[in-house]
Amino acid sequence: MGQPKKWEHVIERTKGILKLRPTYVRRFYKDGGRLGLTKTPGGTFDPRTKLFVPERWIASCVEAHNPHPIKGEGLSKLHLPAPEGEVTLRDLLSEFGTVLLGEKRAKAHNNEFRVLVKILDPAEPIVFHFHARDEDVWAHPEFFAGHRFGKEEAYFFLDAPKGTCPYTHLGLMPGVDEKELLAAIEKGRDRLLELSPYYLQRSGEGYFTPAGVPHRPGTALCLEIQQPSDVYTLLETRADGRTLSPRQVHPGFPDLPTALRFLDFHTAQDPDLLERCRLVPQPIAETKQKGGQEWWIFPPTLTPKFSGKRLVVTGAFESVEEDAYALLIWRGRGKLNGKPIKAGDEFFVSHLAATQPHYFECTGSEPLEAFKLFPQRPF
């Protein structure tokens, strides 16, 4: 990274509230044109790589794993004037973890911000897939090279056009075994999806997806929070009319049957899975103020791996948190500690700033809406 004094000055100048540049990431599924990159669904397609750009990663310290790799893809960078150069959030945390993350977190998590937040913009449902569990990733490095965590994740469905198929499949019907699942994969999507229940993506609500459980996200624009991992196995072999390569379907595995050893059939067939995983925002009484209100959209009781709040400010709102967090301004205009903020802005709010009173103010004609996303608990 170099020039530690320079970056120390940046932290001091911003008082630990670090503005980040938007980070867009390629994927094999078609974008819906709702990230501001194109007005036409699929308009980001690159014929050379056969990839689209349907994801924005927020305050990310995780590198994306894609065919035709780009070094550093997925890593968030500070929003700085060109003469000041550039630095990734990951590198800054590595150098100044105690200040930015707090002493306890920096020590427990080796200067890492252990969460990954995304905005997903699918023009069509993302293919049926699952993510491995922590214990499987740790026990089988021969299959999960380069990965340190499994992936639990959760979604919050944003107030935006939902697309053509706002339904998500989650889990498997009772009695489905590996043999039946493999046969359905061979027959294609229609047969495969008959084996999985589904739910409507309701704007303003969310869902939790346990690691190891297959799912097929629908076309609603959503905020996703997850463990800091890009591990996955696909259960479909075609997307957007194109045949996917074995490397895309089961990266790290010699074949799909081997990859299916890590699917959690027991949890996937829980008859109460859909209801148990539904997330309805919970008002936070202790932070309610005249000028604003917060809700848990990913409550800390859900999992120790992450949590998140929705904040709506109509006047002035004083915020104090126990931990550093990622901040996304979703709607409206306002100020944060007196400095202008607007929809689309993204910040890393360090432990230094988060644990002291910091002030949101709505200055526009509509409420200021933001999301606060928190990492894995350190203990």
In which residue ranges do the predicted regions lie?
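Transition-metal
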Residues: M1-D177, A239-R276, P281, G308
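Ligand-binding loop in jelly-roll beta-barrel domains
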Residues: L120-P125, A160-G163, G212-V231, P340, ...
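Short, basic/aromatic beta-hairpin or loop at an interaction surface
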Residues: V176-R189, E322-A326
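Loop-centered beta-sheet repeat module
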Residues: I185-T243
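Short acidic-glycine-tyrosine-enriched beta hairpin
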Residues: S196-F208, P217, K335-E361
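Non-heme Fe(II)/2-oxoglutarate
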Residues: T219-H250, D323, G344-V349, A353-P357
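Functionally critical, mid-to-C-terminal surface segments that flank or help form catalytic/ligand
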Residues: T258-A324
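Short beta-strand segments in beta-sandwich/barrel cores
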Residues: A316, G332-N337
